[in-house]
Amino acid sequence: MGEYIMEKNTIILGIETSCDETAVAVVKNGTEIIANVVASQIESHKRFGGVVPEIASRHHVEEITVVLEEALKEANITFDDIDAIAVTEGPGLVGALLIGVNAAKAVAFAHDIPLVGVHHIAGHIYANRLVKEVQFPLLSLVVSGGHTELVYMKEHGSFEVIGETRDDAAGEAYDKVARTLSMPYPGGPHIDRLAHEGKPTIDLPRAWLEPDSYDFSFSGLKSAVINTVHNAKQRGIEIAPEDLAASFQESVIDVLVTKASRAADAYNVKQVLLAGGVAANKGLRARLEAEFAQKENVELIIPPLSLCTDNAAMIAAAGTIAYEQGKRATLALNANPGLDIES
């Protein structure tokens, strides 16, 4: 009888500190979450109406060791069980990134564990692999506070940005519009909730740009909302905030979904993946589902809410691919706030 040899599992420890979440996770074989611990700082930044870099860094320093220990305990493993450490090296806030990178390097050095640097957006894309195995070619619609882009992938680890924002990211526009409507930070979830109570009765612009472009632009829309509110105040006219939220959200989603759908057809992809913090938006999820339900040959993958916002499981998932492809970082690894996903 032939001997049955079980392939060894690949256990990756992920570390994410690019913005205002301190996160550590353990992922098996790039697809299975063993532990996923996130310490959020939203309450600390709320009163400032946005993330304060210095406060974010200070919180990361306080939390990183605690979160790391908690993840190992939750996974019921020791450092000896870990094949590699994957850490977000960029993009993000440089001071915040440094805390995660230095923690990863310290653990890698102390326990002689291989180190892998991960691009934050690659992490968001690979969060989908924790839901379902990905199939190539694929298209990822990345929508977050700092990024709005369409990324085409022919194979693992290969990223081609075919469309990106020329000014504000969608998440940025959400936060600024929320502030105009006197809503707390982060604005996205509040606008989303309010939009479901209103009707899109206010005519707002949609930036389609050139006919063949997959790029985005949200600064004109953001300005139009601010001007609408300002003009209404000057004239003493009452605008229903829920209608303004619904109109703004419809304008954003129209452009995102239409361009993603067009790109999916043009590039003949097998799957479309939703990624990034704004992927938690109920309106966007519903419109994408309706759009891609009509396309028989394209599978839409939408991650659960817990994997949309920043977390370390997605970094471990992306890190697994990099590790299996033989990519390694040295202890000279540094935070790179302007890291390019195509490099």
UniProtKB/Swiss-Prot annotation:
InterPro entries: ATPase_NBD (IPR043129), Gcp-like_dom (IPR000905), KAE1/TsaD (IPR017861), Peptidase_M22_CS (IPR017860), TsaD (IPR022450). Substrate binds at residues 142-146, 175, 188, 192, 281. Signal peptide: none annotated. Its cofactor is Fe(2+). It catalyses: L-threonylcarbamoyladenylate + adenosine(37) in tRNA = N(6)-L-threonylcarbamoyladenosine(37) in tRNA + AMP + H(+). Its EC number is 2.3.1.234. One of its GO terms (molecular function) is N(6)-L-threonylcarbamoyladenine synthase activity. It comes from the Bacteria. PROSITE patterns: GLYCOPROTEASE. Binds 1 Fe(2+) ion per subunit. One of its GO terms (cellular component) is cytoplasm. One of its GO terms (biological process) is tRNA threonylcarbamoyladenosine modification. Keywords: Acyltransferase, Cytoplasm, Iron, Metal-binding, Transferase, tRNA processing. Fe cation binds at residues 120, 124, 310. Gene3D superfamilies: 3.30.420.40. It is found in: Cytoplasm. The keyword Lipid metabolism does not apply. PANTHER family: TRNA N6-ADENOSINE THREONYLCARBAMOYLTRANSFERASE, TRNA N6-ADENOSINE THREONYLCARBAMOYLTRANSFERASE, MITOCHONDRIAL. Belongs to the KAE1 / TsaD family. Required for the formation of a threonylcarbamoyl group on adenosine at position 37 (t(6)A37) in tRNAs that read codons beginning with adenine. Is involved in the transfer of the threonylcarbamoyl moiety of threonylcarbamoyl-AMP (TC-AMP) to the N6 group of A37, together with TsaE and TsaB. TsaD likely plays a direct catalytic role in this reaction. HAMAP family: TsaD. This is tRNA N6-adenosine threonylcarbamoyltransferase. The gene is tsaD.
